[in-house]
Amino acid sequence: MASLRTEITELATGLGMLGYDNPAEAVSELPPQFIDVTDRVWEQFARVVDESLHRVDFAGAYRNGQVFLEADHGLRGRPPRLIEWKGSHRSPGHDQLPIDLRVDHVYLISCKYSSKILLNAAPSNLFAANQDVGDWYDHAAPQEHQALYAAVREEVGSNIDLPPFVGDLAKHHRTELKLALADRQWSPTCAAAYRELAAEVGRVTASQWRKSVATKRQREALLWRLLRIGPAPYYVLGSARDRSLRLLVTTPWDWRRRFEFRDLEMWGEAAGQPIVGWKATVRDHEAAEETCVDGHVEVRWSHGRFAQAPEAKVYLDTPHTQVPGYLHIDDAERWAGRISGTEIQLPLS
């Protein structure tokens, strides 16, 4: 389910495109142009946007919508007739474009506020395993995974009836173990076991990932996947640190017109948790120079230690504005105050 902050930024982005005279008018009633926004969602949105906790988020997102309305590479001053909100709906399949709003059936919008996450994926899908893997830690580092589990099981003691082997954990075991570990720091023994697990998972995962993209064309396609460059162009409206983010994400066709892929490297990092770093080198023909884009993948438990099988979270470490294939639709503006902060008061009236 989408968080309240996510709903606020996505709906405010759409509102900014509709050409209202002021924000107070914009939130006075549910616009007829909005599709798939329920009365319950709208009422909550209209009630909280003027609270101090959410004013900065609302104002920044609303401004992004206003800029998109006037941008030459956006709506060119024509308020849309239709804004479809995706909300919590999930598209079937893997790695769909990260779209939150669809405007007039044509303009695809991704609202990304203070997030460096590019993609959440099943490790077996991202790292191209030959088979579906239930628990990536068991696949990449079975001995280290079992050693960590044994240490945790011994510390938890008789409070929970747990099976001797980590591979035998059922859903109810995982739930109980998650609760038992929620307020507990790793002991020195468990911390050492976790470091060994992290190092081995990073090493094995990076090695398997490299083998799965043996050719230059495969590595180029993987880079496009990591950067969420797909068959249709879309816009990213959001924020990065203290600046607005207004970008057009191009397609592979557009990308190859300007850029030439050189290489993509992957390696396991000694970071205290399972991490695989990645770095792509690209030739920018327009600028007549080589450029790099960096990121990393965290292979970590979903929703708490041992709660679920690990997932792969792909992060972008290079600023969005410096990524090959991400084009500016305007000059970025500074944000006043911290995101979701209470220091800056931006009343709607």
Annotated model-derived regions:
Residues 1-99, 103-349:
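Short, positively charged
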